[in-house]
Regions:
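Short glycine/serine/threonine-rich phosphate/pyrophosphate-binding segments
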Residues: 16-23, 52-55, 169
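Glycine-rich phosphate/pyrophosphate-binding beta-alpha loops
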Residues: 50, 155-188, 275-281
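Short, amphipathic C-terminal "tail helix"
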Residues: 261-307
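N-terminal small/polar loop signature for handling phosphorylated ligands or for N-terminal nucleophile
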Residues: 1-34, 136-147
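Gly/Pro-rich interdomain helix-loop hinge
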Residues: 182, 186-264, 304-305
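C-terminal and late-domain segments of enzyme folds
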Residues: 96-156, 160
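A glycine/threonine-rich phosphate-anchoring loop and its flanking beta-alpha core
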Residues: 26-117, 208-219
């Protein structure tokens, strides 16, 4: 890097490509002050509708079997270019995975301890657009109107979570993906409903702030939500219905992960999730027991009681 310090870095690709470019930017930033160099201009052009990395100061990089989250203001691109024609050829399975990642970003930013009026407004719009347009993208990738709406939703979700951060769905998904190479969006989709239920205290009083906010999302989706519990129930059903519509796996056991290997590495994944940088802003503070049970629920796909 010292011999060919760039003036411009362009990242053209999916979230992993943009995150890799961010790692380069981060490495350059460590030497820039001593060398008296300007930070390179950074242009991000996403070719999937998923991470929203083109507008965030986050980068996820893999070190051995662990995914590490970098957070630094230098990682925020200077220019983001959104072109829905670049995502028209994305296959249905990847469209589903990345689209559920968008939904997860919105849900987690919305109930984050760092949420604000600004991130809430973005997250609410994202949730509405995902349920309205993701199925159309999955059925017909050449539907550029649906593609544009999902591409915009991905970007808006990135804007929401770069300001509000995320929660334990991402913490658990980072560990699951790092250990068993489950695609990130798919890992989020497998864990999302279980975390929603746990954050809402669904099997308890179901009257947490998170439960009430989830119920508001259900109301915005024109689903039954006369009480927090009814709203959370509606949202959980809507999430599962969306996954089923796109033929997504219901449980980790449907993804090819070996049961014995899963049990053997469960404690390792829980430890990774506990120290993940997304965990502190989760609306409900988890411990190892809770995360272990959430993984076990996600293994079978059944939402059960978890304290």
């Amino acid at each position: 890097m010292d011999s060919c310090y760039p003036d411009l870095v362009i990242a053209l690709g999916g979230g992993s490509v943009i995150d890799a470019a961010k790692a380069v930017i981060f490495a350059l930033a460590q030497t820039r002050p001593e060398a008296g160099r300007e930070r390179p201009c950074f242009v991000a052009i996403p070719t999937t509708s998923g991470t929203g990395s083109e507008v965030t100061s986050f980068s996820v990089v893999k070190a051995h079997a662990e995914k590490l989250v970098l957070v630094d203001s230098s990682l925020l691109p200077d220019i983001a270019i959104l072109d829905p024609s670049l995502v028209a050829s994305v296959p249905p399975a990847i469209t589903a995975d990345t689209g559920m990642d968008v939904l997860c970003h919105a849900l987690e930013a919305y109930v984050s301890l760092a949420a604000s009026d600004f991130s809430d407004a973005l997250a609410e719009k994202v949730v509405q657009q995902v349920f309205s347009y993701l199925p159309g993208c999955w059925r017909n990738g050449q539907d550029l109107q649906a593609r544009e709406k999902m591409h915009n939703a991905s970007c808006m979700a990135g804007m929401a979570f770069t300001n509000a951060s995320l929660g334990i769905t991402h913490s658990l998904a980072h560990a699951l993906g790092g250990v068993f190479r489950v695609p990130h969006g798919r890992a989020n989709a497998l864990l999302m409903a279980h975390v929603v239920a746990w954050n809402a205290d669904y099997h308890g009083q179901c009257d947490t702030l998170a439960a009430r906010k989830y119920a508001r999302l259900a109301h915005l989706l024109d689903l039954p939500a006369s009480t927090p519990r009814e709203g959370v129930t509606s949202l959980l059903v809507a999430i599962q219905t969306l996954k089923d519509e796109m033929n997504m796996p219901r449980g980790i056991n449907d993804t090819g992960v070996n049961a014995a290997d899963f049990d053997q590495r469960l404690a390792e994944m829980v430890a990774q999730a506990l120290r993940d940088s997304c965990t502190p802003t989760n609306p409900r503070e988890p411990d190892a027991r809770a995360l272990t049970e959430l993984y076990r629920q996600a293994w079978s796909g059944n939402i059960a009681q978890c304290h």
